[in-house]
Amino acid sequence: MEAIAKHRFASISPQKARLVADQIRGKSVDQALEILTFSNKKAAVIIKKVVESAIANAEHNEGADIDDLNVAKIFVDEGPIMKRIMPRAKGRADRILKRSSHITIVVADR
């Protein structure tokens, strides 16, 4: 059985979130939470909440045992990009891209 949790429009770039996602792919949920707890990346805090949500979904909706769960799939897709302007010298302007992510986690039995 599988349980899914998503965090859409997370305010972190997909490139940075994928660094953390690659570390927990295929691990047991206990091991994944441990890795995320001791990581000092912003993405780790966001992804940890999604993993905890997926665990709660598996327990509540599917009646799964937490000890048997592992991170079957985790992927980070690109969300919408907000474009902002940063004023520069001599009347010029640069574009700043505020990137967002859609984080999806699937937990399943081993």
Swiss-Prot record:
Belongs to the universal ribosomal protein uL22 family. This is Large ribosomal subunit protein uL22. SUPFAM superfamilies: Ribosomal protein L22 (SSF54843). One of its GO terms (cellular component) is cytosolic large ribosomal subunit. GO terms for biological process: translation. GO terms for molecular function: rRNA binding; structural constituent of ribosome. It comes from Aliivibrio salmonicida (strain LFI1238) (Vibrio salmonicida (strain LFI1238)). Part of the 50S ribosomal subunit. This protein binds specifically to 23S rRNA; its binding is stimulated by other ribosomal proteins, e.g. L4, L17, and L20. It is important during the early stages of 50S assembly. It makes multiple contacts with different domains of the 23S rRNA in the assembled 50S subunit and ribosome. InterPro entries: Ribosomal_uL22, Ribosomal_uL22_bac/chlpt-type, Ribosomal_uL22_bac/org-type, Ribosomal_uL22_CS, Ribosomal_uL22_sf. The keyword Cell wall biogenesis/degradation does not apply. The lineage of its organism: Bacteria, Pseudomonadati, Pseudomonadota, Gammaproteobacteria, Vibrionales. Keywords: Ribonucleoprotein, Ribosomal protein, RNA-binding, rRNA-binding.
